[in-house]
């Protein structure tokens, strides 16, 4: 395994090598043989395309399944407001997120009849 006791800053790129998202944490560990990375302690994930930021204390990146997830409290800040949850699931590219047990303020547009 490779340990990052002083933290890490990862960049995720699209096919044209533009930075789509970033992940920072104060600690990380990567198990190359398991294709698994765990980061914790002030984890911040930024999705530049959607102008969203997710804050939490623990994230697992399962490279074999191409999934990123957490089982602890998360705060997701979007242009429309702040939503809280008890964990999240996302695809590896961080384009699709699903908060577990979400709560907060939600904006809905009413349909006209």
Cite the ranges covered by each PLM segment.
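Mature-chain termini and adjacent capping regions
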Residues: 1-113
């Amino acid at each position: 395994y490779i340990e990052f006791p002083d933290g890490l800053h990862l960049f995720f790129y699209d096919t044209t090598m533009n930075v789509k998202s970033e992940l920072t944490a104060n600690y990380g560990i990567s198990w190359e043989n398991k294709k698994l990375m765990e980061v914790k302690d002030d984890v911040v994930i930024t999705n530049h395309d959607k102008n969203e930021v997710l804050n939490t204390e623990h994230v697992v990146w399962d490279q074999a399944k191409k999934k990123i997830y957490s089982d602890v409290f998360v705060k997701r800040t979007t242009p429309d407001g702040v939503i809280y949850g008890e964990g999240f699931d996302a695809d590896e590219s961080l384009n699709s997120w699903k908060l577990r047990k979400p709560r907060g303020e939600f904006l809905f547009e009413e349909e006209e009849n």
